[in-house]
Structure formats: C-alpha cells, structure tokens
From Swiss-Prot:
Cysteines paired by S-S bonds: none
Cellular localisation: Cell membrane
Any one Gene Ontology BP term: regulation of oligodendrocyte differentiation
Tissues and organs where the protein is expressed, per its UniProt entry: Brain specific; expressed in oligodendrocytes. Expressed in oligodendrocytes in remyelinating multiple sclerosis plaques.
Region (Required for plasma membrane localization): 77-93
Protein name (database record): Opalin
Source organism of this protein record: Homo sapiens
Amino acid sequence: MSFSLNFTLPANTTSSPVTGGKETDCGPSLGLAAGIPLLVATALLVALLFTLIHRRRSSIEAMEESDRPCEISEIDDNPKISENPRRSPTHEKNTMGAQEAHIYVKTVAGSEEPVHDRYRPTIEMERRRGLWWLVPRLSLE
C-alpha cells in the first residue's frame, strides 16, 4: 500500500486569507506601520543625545564653579564648607619629618572636634600597609 499527498494548487487560487471576495491593498498602510517604530527610535535617540549634551554642559559649568578657590568669608558664612571642606588651601602633601596639622571645626552645639582628613589614610590602613610582608604569597601554578 502506498500513501502520497499532493499539495499543488490550481492556477486560479491564491494562498492569501479569504477577504470575502474583496481585494484590499495593504501596501501604503504596511509601509506606514513599518516606519512608525523607526520614527520612535529616532526620536528617542535625539532625546538621549540632547540629555547627554545638557548633562555634560551642566557638569562642566559646575566644575568650573567649584574650581574657584573659596574666600575666607565664604567658608565662615557657609556651614557646609566649614564642616566638610572639599579642598583645604593649607593642605600640603605629607613629607617625611613634617608635622601633622590638626584642624578643628566648631560644631553647631559649640564644641570643637577634629576633622578627619579623607585624603590621608587612617592609622589602621597605614598599619595594614606596613604588614604586607606577613601575607603569604599564593601562586596559581
């Protein structure tokens, strides 16, 4: 017994869905539908570029403003600068044999407390760096 299927279509039939005997032309609407995502993607790309340019300009302006040295009167008038200085004009690199400078800040309560220098490692970090030779050398061989 042999079994075979024949999938040939007669010449007058099409493989398109049945539309009730009416022919519709979907050409221009399909082209417009395909162009909408492209337009949306282009608009998003332009918005992203505009946002990046705006952020870069504002950060450059803020950087130029912060590079200006502070006057003494500005430091005294602004409690944020006097409590947490970003850059101390008297700060020098620590050289061997140089004395440490102690900076005290008057708090809101009126007491004076030393300010931690964020650019100088803490005593614990210096102690850890001094004991580097105690760490065993591990090899991956």
